[in-house]
Amino acid sequence: MSKRATIFLDIDGVLHPNSVGELEYGPNGPVVVGQGVCSLQTKLAERVSGKAVDIAIHSTWIYMFDLKRLQDEYLRELSAAAKIYLTNRRIESRSLRITDYMRRRRLTLADVLILDDAPKEFASAPELLSRLVVCDPTRGIDDPAVLQQIDEFVS
């Protein structure tokens, strides 16, 4: 497996404000409904399109949806712009899922950027804090400072 720059992506509070979306259960299992769900993926897709950057989802959404369903139902634009992977759902901690993914792909800290709205999730892995871009959960990546850090990482 080739070593590529990787953006680790949370979804709630990053690709949409955390006030957006409701979890419902339908005949095919869980579904997140509501206007604006994953609406900020366009901003990220524009920035990674044509770049040698992968996306690795570390969000709790990996417990509800497999990769195909995430791509088909929630992340179409982002999927068209970058290769998307999931972190290991058998690992409970977000930070441990990220360090496991990095270890398996031999990624260094310089190879990664982490987008998340919950910095406390990384208390057990202080080595990741330098790569963490904390999003305001009411804005997600719709913040000039966050977008600038993404732009700097992918350039």
List the model feature ranges, each with a label.
Residues S2-G50:
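Active-site neighborhood of HAD-like aspartate-dependent phosphohydrolases
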Residues R4-T6, D54, D111-L113:
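Structural motif
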Residues L9, H58-M64, L115-D117:
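Short His-Asn-centered micro-motif
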Residues H16, W61-I62, D100-R104:
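Tryptophan-centric aromatic hotspots in well-structured domains and transmembrane helices
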Residues Q35, Y63-F65, R90-E92:
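Acidic-and-aromatic substrate-binding clefts and catalytic sites of carbohydrate-active enzymes
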Residues K51-Q71:
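Substrate-recognition element of Asp-dependent hydrolases with the DxDx(T/V) motif
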Residues K68-S155:
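C-terminal cap/substrate-recognition subdomain and adjoining C-terminal extension
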